[in-house]
From Swiss-Prot:
Binding site for NADP(+): 10-11, 31-32, 38, 53, 76-80, 93, 145, 173, 181
EC number: 5.1.3.20
Gene coding for it: hldD
Native species: Brachyspira hyodysenteriae (strain ATCC 49526 / WA1)
Protein name per UniProt: ADP-L-glycero-D-manno-heptose-6-epimerase
Keywords: Carbohydrate metabolism, Isomerase, NADP
Domain notes: Contains a large N-terminal NADP-binding domain, and a smaller C-terminal substrate-binding domain.
Binding positions for substrate per the UniProt entry: N172, R183, H190, F204, E205, G206, S207, R212, Y276
Catalytic activity: ADP-D-glycero-beta-D-manno-heptose = ADP-L-glycero-beta-D-manno-heptose
Note describing how the cofactor binds: Binds 1 NADP(+) per subunit.
Record function comment: Catalyzes the interconversion between ADP-D-glycero-beta-D-manno-heptose and ADP-L-glycero-beta-D-manno-heptose via an epimerization at carbon 6 of the heptose.
Active site (UniProt): Y141, K181
Length: 318
């Protein structure tokens, strides 16, 4: 059996679908459906069972792995709101919870794949190579991810990791199944909906200078599957395309699909000043050295592919 935490979420549900494509459906989905709209993310994926995240505590997980043959855990569940200001909640949910899962996996030799984040690099002034000297988180969400990565790296250095553990530092992910994310959904999602509402696409002033590494969810799933199929490879890896493109390129891609669409530039919000990554670009040397050699979609290709899904199914897997 495989456990996917956050399995009703954006990345988690796509990972379940990716496992389905490998012929695997003996999956336990862990999530919280307090936001009931997330149930739509489960409609087109196959899994054996579901449990609420609040019930999936340390005691439950310990008992479950003692009574079931668990091959791997894809830990994608976390608070991903970069504007969350409750540091105690963030550290308990993202750091302590992940640490508990890690130690159960190490004890039982269960393979662990978990979601880290490119936000650990802060403003990126030192680059985006997987090295502690490059890491300087700008908010408490990023710090929670950074702190767990540091904890794991210490275990690696002490030779205390005796089973596969892979952390993937996701860059700016977009694609199907993110409808429930609200303000945290991708720029592509929001711009598409503005077009459909008859509005102009709204992007921040200076967006042509804001360069991000935008990665389509299908590429994220492909990287996860690569490590799942290569159990001898462990470590923390960047998961981006290796190319930085501007927010304007997203708008241009949508404009190629919706010819009448236009852009409106809006003021940059004060609430984001000093907490906003203006530039991200994954360094892929470590990922490529691990053997992942597939190409990544650029913004133009990926956004058009996403727009097709948004048009046909409202943004859900088909």
């Amino acid at each position: 059996m495989i456990i996917v935490t956050g399995g009703a979420g954006f990345i988690g549900s796509n990972i379940v679908k990716g496992l389905n494509n490998l012929g695997i459906d003996d999956i336990l989905v862990v999530d919280n459906l307090k936001n009931a709209s997330k149930h739509k993310n489960l409609n087109r994926i196959k899994f054996r069972d579901y449990i609420d995240k609040e019930d999936f505590n340390l005691d439950y997980l310990t008992s479950f792995v003692n009574n079931n043959k668990v091959e791997a855990i894809f830990h994608q569940g976390a608070c991903s709101d970069t504007m969350e200001t409750d540091g105690k909640y963030m550290m308990k949910n993202n750091y302590e919870y992940t640490k508990n899962i890690l130690h159960i996996c190490l004890d039982k030799k269960i393979r662990l794949f978990y979601a880290s984040s490119a936000s650990v690099y802060g403003n990126g002034e030192n680059g985006f190579e997987e090295d502690e000297k490059n890491e300087y988180p700008l908010n408490v969400y990023a710090f929670s991810k950074y702190h767990f990565d540091r904890y794991l790296n210490k275990l690696f250095k002490e030779n205390k990791v005796n089973s596969q553990v892979v952390g993937l530092r996701y860059f700016n992910v977009y694609g199907p199944q993110e409808n429930h994310k609200g303000r945290m959904a991708s720029v592509a999602f929001h711009l598409f909906n503005q077009i459909k509402a008859g509005e102009r696409m709204k992007i921040f002033e200076g967006s042509e200078n804001f360069l991000r590494d935008f990665i389509h969810i299908d590429d994220v799933v492909s990287v996860n599957n690569f490590f799942f199929e290569n159990p001898n490879k462990s470590g923390i890896f960047n998961c981006g395309t290796g190319n930085a493109e501007s927010f304007v390129e997203i708008a241009k891609a949508l404009k190629e699909v919706y010819k009448s669409a236009s852009i409106e530039y809006i003021a940059f919000p004060d609430a984001l000043r000093g907490k906003y990554q203006k530039y991200t670009q994954a360094d892929l040397k470590k990922l490529r050295a691990a053997g992942y050699d597939k190409p990544f979609m650029n913004v133009n290709t990926g956004v058009k592919k996403y727009a097709e899904v948004l048009e046909k199914s409202g943004g859900y897997l088909m």
